[in-house]
From Swiss-Prot:
It comes from Brucella melitensis biotype 1 (strain ATCC 23456 / CCUG 17765 / NCTC 10094 / 16M). This is Recombination protein RecR. Residues 83-178 form the Toprim domain. The keyword DNA damage applies. Keywords: DNA damage, DNA recombination, DNA repair, Metal-binding, Zinc, Zinc-finger.
Length: 201
């Protein structure tokens, strides 16, 4: 049994921080110490912000995004193209695409990807909601922005099959050489995908 070096409140803070993705036990200890040292500037405001988020954050009933309103800010933005829908696995993917700031469209968050080995099937994802949105007739293109993994490919094929009876164009993100990437450092799968997705100049 390891020795306790701080009171239970600090230990609990460290344990909770260690559950945050990207923070292990050591990083959590460092973060906790930093927060405690900057109590008035960081710890107190962070605690307040977290409490407020816990009370106000909602899952958008339309697209699955997280926001403080339902429907979310993106779904209620009338400047966005209602005919184009980007399908993503998780909210983090939606936020990444928004940071790219290339398309002013709406989204649909699946809440994961199909993974039979992990027991995740179609009923565990928000695929039914996607089909219902497409069935409304307002959407003309569905862009599948799922990850280039085996599970992502499986999810994309399943969704394409589910939407095959609708008058909607289903596309997917091109995969290949990243901007600034050097060919020598890329794996064979990435190079093969880049060659298949080549474009005319």
């Amino acid at each position: 049994m390891s020795k306790r070096i701080a009171g239970p409140e600090i230990e609990r803070l460290i344990q909770l921080l260690a559950r945050v993705p990207g923070l292990g036990p050591r990083s959590a200890r460092r973060a906790a110490l930093h927060l405690i040292k900057k109590k008035e500037a960081l710890l107190v405001p962070l605690g307040g912000a977290m409490q407020e988020a816990a009370e106000k954050v909602r899952i958008c009933s339309c697209c699955g995004n997280v926001d403080t309103s339902d429907p979310c800010t993106i779904c209620t933005d009338e400047r966005r193209d209602p005919a184009t829908l980007i399908v993503v696995e998780d909210v983090s993917d939606l936020w990444a695409l928004e940071r790219a700031d290339t398309m002013n469209v709406r989204y649909h968050v699946l809440g994961g990807r199909l993974s039979p080995l992990d027991g995740i099937g179609p009923d565990d994802l928000n695929i039914k909601g996607l089909v219902e949105r497409v069935a409304s007739g307002a959407i003309k293109e569905v862009i599948l922005a799922v990850n280039a993994t085996v599970e992502g490919q499986t999810t994309a094929h399943y969704i394409t099959d589910q939407l095959s009876n609708f008058d909607v164009r289903v596309t997917r993100l091109a995969h290949g050489v990243p901007v600034g990437g050097e060919l020598d450092y890329l794996d064979e799968g990435t190079l093969a995908a880049a060659l298949r997705a080549r474009t005319t100049l």
